[in-house]
Design a protein with these regions (language model features):
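Short acidic catalytic loops
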Residues: 1-2, 178-179
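Active-site-facing alpha/beta catalytic cores
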Residues: 3-174
Length: 179
């Protein structure tokens, strides 16, 4: 971090939720004992303890938010968040991104398409109102101001990586056209 700190911020990727295409382990928060017991309270405690440990090392932490309730429990410890390729087209996740209090990267679709993430960026950067959880833990109407730090993450797709110069230029042109 000392060497690159003026141009690059290194963060620890700490993913607690596992998006599933079909079935399987859903991650530390949902199943910390890896046995299907779904001890959510234990998983949330473990996630917070791990994040506090990372922060105690002086390293910012990042995660992918999958369940829209999870940010209420760990967002205060997260410096950068992601909305994944499997959820970028979800209205729920776009609305959630609009209210996150940290920069959020929205990934292109699993097939590599950019239009879904461009649509998601427009939604995430604008005010939203939706059914959610208040700071007091009560179901309520949540209103956001939009996330001015929402941005695109090129994560590749069916045709391979998309972080080469041509792919980045295409993404940039599509973003400029959408504005």
């Amino acid at each position: 971090r000392d060497e690159l700190g003026d141009t690059l911020e290194l963060v620890m990727r700490v993913y607690f939720e596992k998006p599933r295409t079909s079935i399987g382990w859903k991650g530390l928060i949902m199943d910390p004992d890896l046995d299907g017991s779904d001890n959510l309270a234990k998983g949330l405690r473990m996630a917070r303890q791990l994040l506090c440990g990372v922060l105690d090392l002086g390293v910012p932490a990042s995660t992918e938010f999958l369940d829209p309730i999870t940010p209420q429990y760990i967002a205060d410890l997260i410096s950068w968040a992601a909305i994944g390729a499997r959820t970028v087209e979800s209205q729920t996740h776009r609305q959630m991104a609009s209210g996150l209090s940290m920069p959020v990267g929205l990934k292109n679709a699993t097939n590599g398409a950019l239009t879904p993430v461009i649509n998601a960026l427009q939604a995430a950067s604008h005010p939203q109102t939706f059914f959610g959880i208040s700071a007091e833990g009560v179901a309520s109407l949540v209103s956001t101001t939009g996330n001015p730090s929402a941005h695109m993450v090129l994560r590749g797709g069916e045709d391979g990586p998309n972080y080469d110069a041509d792919s980045v230029a295409t993404a940039r042109a599509m973003l400029e056209k959408a504005d």
